[in-house]
From Swiss-Prot:
GO cellular component terms listed in the entry, alphabetical order: cytoplasm
SMART domains on file: Arg_tRNA_synt_N (SM01016), DALR_1 (SM00836)
Substrates-to-products reaction catalysed: tRNA(Arg) + L-arginine + ATP = L-arginyl-tRNA(Arg) + AMP + diphosphate
Subunit structure, interactors included: Monomer.
Name this protein carries in UniProt: Arginine--tRNA ligase
Amino acid sequence: MDTKTLIASEIAKVVPELEQDAIFNLLETPKNSDMGDLAFPAFSLAKVLRKAPQMIASELAEQIDESQFEKVVAVGPYINFFLDKAKISSQVLEQVITAGSDYAQQDEGQGRNVAIDMSSPNIAKPFSIGHLRSTVIGDSLAHIFAKMGYKPVKINHLGDWGKQFGMLIVAYKKWGDEAAVQAHPIDELLKLYVRINAEAETDPTVDEEAREWFRKLEDGDKEATELWQWFRDESLLEFNRLYDQLHVTFDSYNGEAFYNDKMDEVLELLEAKNLLVESKGAQVVNLEKYGIEHPALIKKSDGATLYITRDLAAALYRKRTYDFAKSVYVVGNEQAAHFKQLKAVLKEMGYDWSDDMTHVAFGLVTKGGAKLSTRKGNVILLEPTVAEAINRAASQIEAKNPNLADKEAVAHAVGVGAIKFYDLKTDRMNGYDFDLEAMVSFEGETGPYVQYAHARIQSILRKADFTPSATTTYSLADAESWEIIKLIQDFPRIIKRTSDNFEPSIMAKFAINLAQSFNKYYAHTRILDDNSERDNRLALCYATATVLKEALRLLGVDAPNEM
């Protein structure tokens, strides 16, 4: 139990008028540490108890069990709590040393599934930095949900269907070179895609021809299907090479095409419930009662189905297949209206489990303030970017530690980790401007900075030849140690907040805070001095490294032992 929860529970025992959660939210940290570690303002009880806040604080301070604290005193209208730092540090260190990487493991999920729709790049298009956000946010949330006791199911809902395949088939038949595509599939397909889109802007017949080829594809035309399958296979080979570099795996690659034969059932269900309304020849579902002005367009006047029809089929399939406790869609915030419609249509169909679906939206990645666009050829491709990040990391490692063993593996961990961490430390609803130099820096709020703090601690532990014993009591009460202890103790709550808010930036900021606190401690404390505090300080180092490594793992970032 963290100290804030402990204090809230002790106050709740003597204040039945307030719920423990309400007390927890009222607790404050005094500006001056001489006034205690946490304080409870009695103002909120004045009306209920019909007493002055000062009197309430004085009376309650007398009633609270002080055995858990150094002291409890009333100061004006506040009850100030002074924590027993030695006792708490001993408990926290024991918990981390005993549990190791399982420290802060929770059982909220009880093994239930969480479906995570993530990454989902478009076939025959390059994997760009724009796809990175969905990939790394989804991967981090999968780790977080597992830490909360859920079983994550990572779904790569590939963009392997749609009019763009009509465009690509037209382009390939006009200008395609089979040998060139086989040699450099994504590069060649991207060139074809950009070229055909440029031509379509001045020649309206291109769109008509593309629509015709896509209709053939929908009807199972042999030539169209073979080309589509080839584009898909070549793209997946390239994507999987990148996923291997990012250390990201999936449980399902069922993309849009997988649901082609599952949409008729959706239409039948909607018709059976009389939810479909004709509008200008199209079939729609009205959602005004959900505060959604525009109806959900299910079927166009030419009989073609839309994304939402496919997503309805996917939602039904996932619920039946995984019986998820939560289903999250890690998709850009420009799709917010689509997901509101999706949930509302499912609700109209009578599926209350739609309440368990969440659109985990995120902002755009820009370059020099400009929006990225595959169609216009303005992209930052991930593969060369990862290679450049690894090279930059290797240069810095060579300068800092030229005799390091496994330099290539460490450079990979640092370079890839730098890109992931920079993305994840940003509040997901905010975008960020891509800056590789800032990402790979060992200074500032970066992945390499946190990784280096972990490696520094491992170096200290190796030098001291120290391994903590689960049967030894370690304890610290100095101010510098206390800042670290408080953060380590807060780790379980940070994990839960990250999970509840679908917000990996909470975890990334925690990792930065812990690394900064340790570096400050390292600068002011002679850790290896041979005195009575040496083992206590080393135990703190061990616990800090354990939690730093686990925080990075939950972000999908490796923590090398040497850098």
